[in-house]
Every structure is written in C-alpha cells, then in structure tokens.
Regions:
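A general alpha-helix detector
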Residues: 1, 61, 82-85, 97, ...
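Cytochrome P450
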Residues: 72-78
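Short, solvent-exposed helix-helix connector turns and helix-capping sites enriched
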Residues: 79, 106-109, 135
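Acidic, His- and aromatic-enriched active-site or binding-groove loops in soluble protein domains
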Residues: 91-114, 119, 229-232
C-alpha cells in the first residue's frame, strides 16, 4: 500500500521521501500451529536517498524506536549481495535449499549438502562462521577472489577508510557519502555495506556484522538486519 501510494501520489515530490506505516497484515497460507496468518507490522520506507545513508538512517531509526520503549536489543547486520554472489557458483536447483538451511541455521545439513555437491570450497561456511569485523575482512577476501586477478582499480580498504573518516567528521543525517572513483560490481556493493556500518557507528549504533542473516524473498538483495531482544527473540 505504501509503494502504491507513492507511485500514484508522490512520484513527482522532492526526494528523498520518508514514509511510515502501521497496521494489520495477512499471510496467504494455510493455518498451522505456532504461526498466525494475521499479524501487525510497523515499517518505514526511505525513497530516493543514497544507499548507505538511507540504510544507516533506517537502521538507526529502528534502534531508536526500540530504545524509546525500553527494549535493549542486539543489532545484527548482513549483506545478501555477497551471499548471492557465492551461491552463483552453485547449480541453481540447489540454491533455495541452501538459503533455507542458512536461514534456519541448519549447519550440519548445510555442511553435508555442500560436500555432496562439491561446493565446500567456495568459502560460504567460513564466512557464516565469522562475526563482527572479522566477517567483513573475510568478505573482502572473497570479493577479491570473485573478481579475479587484475580487476581491481582501487583497494577496498582505501575507500572504507575514506568513508570512515567522512562518517566521523560529519553529521550522519543528510550527508553525501564519498563514492569517488569506484568501479561497478561486487566490490562497489561491499564498499557501500562497509559505509553503512561506519555510518551506524557515527549514529552511535552498535551492530554485529553477521552474514548468516538471509531472506528467501527475491527483493531482499542488499543490506539486511535483525534486532534480537531478550524475551522477544
């Protein structure tokens, strides 16, 4: 409904547009134990902003809302673009099952399946095991492997340092991210993900980098996050 309203009423309005919604929703599925077809959902949309800035603003908003009602949660943030790049090395018929195993944290089944299809070498399990900055360091190594030799025009760390310095020096809201001299492809996406993490630090939001966060729906293709709160999940 929010995007329908934007398309019909707000397309010509100045960008970025910040919209929010709150209401009951329904899942189109059969009744089953422990899962309700009707549920309440609150959300926001930031349309027309730059990726790292918009993503950091939305995550910081979620953190602020939780804190305002007394919820202290741990934020885990991941990047599906890298996971999908790794899965591109695997036959298409195996990808849905692998995504489901990652989502459900069925590590033993995932390990067995990767062994059976001869894909235990692609670095997926190692990446999922890493958390925090170590996960991002390993992700950058994987990006270099995906790109192959001689395809890098600028080191990831150089752009990351530039983004980090800018994030510390300027206020997060409304700033333009430093994206000078980048190449198109997996590296650019990972650079933007690192910028998002740096911007969250500038907002004062603590987060854990966790590439084990995945979503099965196809429109989830970039940064994803979850907030875990004791007693809530």
């Amino acid at each position: 409904p929010v995007m329908r309203m934007y398309v019909s009423e707000l397309q010509n309005s100045p960008k970025p547009q910040r919209l929010w919604y709150f209401g009951n929703c329904f899942r189109y599925e059969r009744p089953q134990r422990g899962r309700f077809r009707e549920f309440w959902q609150i959300g926001c949309e930031l349309i027309g902003g730059s990726h790292p800035d918009s993503e950091a603003e939305a995550i910081a908003l979620a953190d602020s809302m939780c804190r305002s009602v007394g919820i202290r949660g741990d934020i885990h943030i991941g990047y599906l673009g890298l996971i999908r790049s790794l899965l591109a090395r695997i036959a298409a018929q195996h990808r849905p099952a692998i995504m489901r195993m990652i989502d459900k944290k069925e590590r033993a089944d995932l390990t067995q399946m990767l062994d059976e299809i001869g894909c235990s070498h692609i670095g997926l399990l190692e990446l999922l095991d890493q958390k925090g900055r170590g996960a991002l360091d390993r992700a950058e190594e994987i990006v270099r492997e995906l790109e192959g030799p001689g395809k890098r025009t600028q080191p990831v760390q150089a752009v990351a340092d530039q983004a980090s310095q800018t994030a510390r020096a300027e206020k997060p809201a409304g700033r333009l991210s430093a994206r000078q001299g980048r190449q198109v492809g997996a590296e650019l996406d990972l650079q933007e993900f690192r910028e998002t993490v740096d911007l969250l630090q500038a907002y004062g939001v603590d987060c854990t980098i966790d590439f084990e966060i995945v979503r099965g729906l196809e429109y989830y293709s970039g940064t994803v996050f979850e907030i875990y709160a004791e007693g809530l999940g």
